């Protein structure tokens, strides 16, 4: 039987400083901000999906009685997300990182020839940019 799941719609990272995250993801990475709810979360459009940035101090709390029944959740420590670059444009991405003083931790080719670069957001989350062919896309 084939899986009924079509794709990942959203993925989440957790940060302690939403202002720093907003400046990084909106300013440095130039993702389109969808919405922000105070010090609880900020959401960004990322291609056909959504990147959710949460403050775990807020999302670990149970939902208010008058709120949607989203279960409490939270993560501590460094997470990871990998972005697929438009047109495999590593030069443009590296320029953006360099212009903003963001260090590249690693830049290499996988055994199948796909390239990946790794760097960190202000919260210490591990971010990767890779070619779709890494996963046969």
Q: What are the roles of these predicted feature ranges?
A:
Residues 13-16, 85-87:
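Short, surface-exposed ligand-recognition loops at beta-strand->loop->(often short) alpha-helix junctions
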Residues 126-129:
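Short glycine-/small-residue motifs
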Residues 17, 121-124:
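Conserved phosphate-binding and hydrolysis motifs of nucleotide-dependent enzymes
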Residues 21-28, 97, 124:
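Conserved active-site tyrosine of GNAT-family acetyltransferases
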Residues 15-18, 111:
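Conserved beta-strand-loop-alpha-helix junction that forms the acyl-donor binding cleft
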Residues 1-9, 32-86, 92-120, 133-137:
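Vicinal oxygen chelate
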